[in-house]
Amino acid sequence: MADFTVIGPAHVATLCLPLHAEEPCGDAAMAFALDGAPVDALLLLADGLGHGPHAAQAAQAAVATVAAHPTMPLPELMLTLDEALRHTRGAAIGLMRVEATPQGGRLAFAGVGNTRALRWRGAALQRLASQYGVVGGGVARPVAVQTLDLLPGDWVLMFSDGLDERLELPAPLPEWQRDPGLLCAHLARRWRQGADDIGVLACHWPAQADLADRAECGGC
């Protein structure tokens, strides 16, 4: 079952599934609410190398580090993670900050390793690139940051290489807008690949009609 978070009007869901049910998951996905704008959040996707307990140790070290420094600029935070994970086997990590603007919203993304991120707008997927490397193994400087605008109705997705990077998305279903966890579950069923853990995060940037619907149902 996906974990569900409401940050301002945005709905965020995360789903992490281990390769083997008896093992801890080596992927971690989290959303951290920040003080400031109506929607101001830091999103994390960490994929510990391999799977099993040692991969989980690396992923959870990433979660703890980000939780301790959520307002740090993304390049600095990535370098802090690189130091914090040196005692682990390392991880691929994606960091994304989403925030409200007068025009709608904006995202900033920094990734190292084979985590994937994209903005989904209507029928168009805008994929964001991660730079080569392993966090914990010496991250190359400077850490690149990419920015994109967000419009009402947009989606943001982050996922590990447990899902096919060539995944395609149909027209969004209304129930996904109400509960992005259903989208996470759909992606895990449809696009799982290889022998690896899965980590996926879905964030819906709502349209005004969606906000009205949620207000009527008490934020359901």
Locate each region found by the language model.
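Active-site metal-binding loops of divalent metal-dependent hydrolases
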Residues: D47-L49, T115, D161-G162
